[in-house]
Amino acid sequence: MSSERPDGSAVGDAVPKDTAVGGATDSSRTSNDASQTSQDTAVQETPPKEAPAKEAPAKPASELTQSKWKIALLLGLILMSMFLVALDRSILATAIPRITDEFDSAGDIGWYGSAYLLTCCSFQLLYGKVYTFFDIKTVFVANLLLFEVASAICGAAPSSTVLIVGRALAGIGAAGIFAGTIIAMVFLIPLRHRPKIQGLFGAVFGITSISGPLIGGGFTTNVTWRWCFYINLPIGGVALIAIALWMEVPNKPTANLPLAEKIRGLDLLGTAVFIPCIICLLLALQWGGTTYAWSSGRIIALLVVFSVTFVVYAALQAFRPKTSTIPPLYFLPLWFQTVKGVSAAESGVHLLPVMISMIVGSVTGGFFNAKVGYYSPLAVTGSTIMTIGAALIYTFKVDTSTGRWIGSLILYGIGLGWSFQAPNLAVQTSLAKKDVPSALALIMFVGLLAQAVFVSVGDNVFDTQAARNLSWIPGFTASELTSSGAVSFLTALSPSQRVEAIEDYNSALRKVFMIGLVLCAVCVPGLASMEWKSVKSRGSWDEKPAAKPTDKPTEEKKVPPEAV
């Protein structure tokens, strides 16, 4: 309510202008008796046109301290860094055959991807803590520099072993860049605008999924596979220098903590237990049933170590809560190449419907969430559509028409683009500011871990099911299929055998698609059960609530310190 003065003006009509723009100032925190005289004077001296009936929403600190052009430039540089990391995940696929020919290292093929994924996944949670206690710009620039050095090592690698080491280092840097891009956005962009930006992040991954294999194939064919890594140097160098010079991130409450206290907060003991835990799990899933039998001593030992370290890590998180840290697109090219008989390049073209629709869904979903505010409706709708698309993919047969598989992929891509933003927006809207870095790191870790686990599970399911289906071929052995590759194995068969073998391949791949369908279906109730909150909600921790003309000056004192 506003109190009336002798001249008819209301106290609440003049004061909120300053408090809405500047936040809760020191003067607004003084007692009413001490500030009454100055407020009366301000009311009398303010012309009527200076006291609008409705004030604009308060701007967060990031909009006051940096211009829109500078924030746009910084976002472009951050997106460039994310582009490099995303490109690094897709550009290598077409270069691997040439790499193995040069190094005579067919047995190391799995390590070129696994070394990167193991370190990227294992260090994800640690970086959530690092960004909580240390300067965001310093950590981000350091990881970008590490990624650049690792790319140079990979490009100049004289042997397969050096290349694997370089990939492992690149994974560590990529983990820091993954976490840093989202966390930097939290401090640069107001919550109500973040859905649009996260839509751009999704578009970056979609673009690199399309361009990565094409760029890698072009370098490998026309220049050398080493340029798949060298390309990171000039692009990343520009981003690194510009971010180091221009990025400004507000100080966090933990900035002034002693170094020893920051290190204690990193949960180094938990990390030391967690990293071997995840490595043992991923190695067991990658090797089990393919390189080694599930009953072999190595696989059993890996699973035992994983189980023990997981229990220890869970105990550490439970008893030390103050420091605790807690696949259709992969197999579709194989379906196109084996069942539909297209080339590797053509299979990449056939993925365009799902990639383009995912980009469109991501961008449109971002703008929709920013406009409406509530992210849950689109998340539930998107996950439902994604599940329908996954169900249609599961029904693929040898004679599935072009229109049907294109429509199925479009549905899957649209649903994926609409729903993938929800977890990131949920933690930014619901959690306290100090908890957001760890929560975002946890989300990214779970995504990377799920990718590693279920791709390995899918590999095992396909190899096992295909070997069982093809056992009718005279002299066939499972090792023959894994050593020669699915496509090469088909070409070695007679025409009559090939027709039946293609049916067997399709049956095996449908088992893999069933895994994706189940995972998509599980997402629907999970997203539907999330608390409905709006990114425009009043009192978001990084934006001060808009002042209303009827607010009393004393009500501005109720703004919590963490909202400033």
From Swiss-Prot:
This is MFS-type transporter dmxR4. Signal peptide: none annotated. MFS-type transporter; part of the gene cluster that mediates the biosynthesis of the dimeric xanthones cryptosporioptides. It is a multi-pass membrane protein. InterPro entries: MFS, MFS_dom, MFS_trans_sf. It holds the Pfam family MFS_1. GO terms for cellular component: plasma membrane. Keywords: Glycoprotein, Membrane, Transmembrane, Transmembrane helix, Transport. The chain crosses the membrane at residues 71-91, 106-126, 138-158, 169-189, 199-219, 227-247, 265-285, 299-319, 348-368, 376-396, 405-425, 438-458, 470-490, 512-532. Residues 25-44 have a biased composition (Polar residues). It is found in: Membrane. Disulfide bonds: none annotated. GO terms for molecular function: transmembrane transporter activity. Residues 47-57, 539-564 have a biased composition (Basic and acidic residues). The gene is dmxR4. Glycans are attached at N222, N469. It comes from Cryptosporiopsis sp. (strain 8999). PANTHER family: AFLATOXIN EFFLUX PUMP, PUTATIVE-RELATED (PTHR23501:SF153), MAJOR FACILITATOR SUPERFAMILY (PTHR23501). It comes from the Eukaryota. Belongs to the major facilitator superfamily. TCR/Tet family. Residues 1-61, 534-564 are annotated as: Disordered.
